[in-house]
Amino acid sequence: MKHIYFVLLTAGFCFSAQAEYEVKPLTESQAREYKLDTGFYRKATQVQDILIATSAKVSDLAHQETAYQFDMLMRSMKPGIAERIRKKRVLCLLIGHDEFTSQLPQFTTNKKGEELDFYNWRQRGFLSHIGSRPTVVFAEEDVMEYEGGMQLESILVHEFGHVVHGAGFDEALQKRLTATFENVKKIGIWNDGRAAQRYRRIKSEKSVKLLGALKKSFPDESPKLLRKCLSAGDILVNGEKTNAKVKVNKDDKVLIYFGGPKQCYASRNRSEYWAEIYQCWFNTNRTMDHDHNHIHTRDQLVKYDPIGAKLCEDVLGKPEWRFVSPRKRVGQAHLKNYNYSLNSPKVTDLPHIQKAAYDYYDTYWKEYWQRLYDKHNIKRK
């Protein structure tokens, strides 16, 4: 029966899925039910008993794209699991591309200065709970994949994976997920990410000495080590080995390669493990960075982590639908009249928010420098 179900879904969704997801003013009853501040929230779209709410600043297309993705994801799972999610009356809040998380009435904060910068940078895609209601938060630039937004994976699919886990799993599935994750830790997979830091602090058009910039950015690290890493190929410029005299500008790509194993996000805990393999089931995950290895598709997952893939199959079946970037669906359905190059804004973090992000990653990678000290037999002070 499950095969018939998914064949019918595939054949029928073109007719039954809403070609245009209707964006309406937020109603008083919606505001009461979801406890939404009508001074801020003005627009709403409902799909699969999920309410998408935003300020007036967020585009209707962002509403429609979010609704489309939710609709396809809800159709791409076993009916009983989808029904449990519907009963939770999930709330989705979209942050406008020119809004901050701290402007959402539910997520205001007393943080100030750099702490506020970090909060607004880091918290643009997450799952929370307001009372017992699952509440997902996304940024418009990530859903629509504007320039400057996330274009390498769907944050929406990842976070909705958490909704599926938290709201859709029964006790038996929870226990099975625990056992599946314990198997991951036992056999040691999802520990093959890339131990390398992108260095992005150089913003000048004019070329400057990379060694000098590195010394300034990493004052705790040995200048001798920095020189050695440049000449030995541990610090690459545009993917190439260089030397201590190299000059770079804002357009050059600098990578500090620490080497060795690196824990993937999927091996962090059972919750993130599920969200990561859920993404892969729909062919949308980043590859070969600080949190990811090479696995990003369903076919790859089946070969790499067959037990995790079987869990996905038993929860989701084998739906034909896969995530496809809205940039590649221009001209179709609700994106019929959308011109990506003309209609999508470029999103750039303010300099102080960029600094907060760079500071975070400097701290994140700090312990990995020891690998380079050991490699080159240089004592770390």
What are the residue ranges of the model-derived segments?
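Acidic/His-rich structured neighborhood in mature extracellular/periplasmic domains
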Residues: 21, 29, 37-40, 47-190, ...
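Boundary at the C-terminal end of the N-terminal hydrophobic targeting segment
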Residues: 16-19
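Pan-zinc metallopeptidase signature
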Residues: 271, 276-381
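Active-site rim elements
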Residues: 54-57, 260-268, 295-301
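Post-HExxH zinc-binding segment in Zn-dependent metallohydrolases
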Residues: 166-195, 253, 259-286
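A basic, amphipathic helix-loop patch mediating RNA/tRNA/ribosome contacts
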Residues: 192-258
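Sec-dependent N-terminal signal peptides
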Residues: 4-13
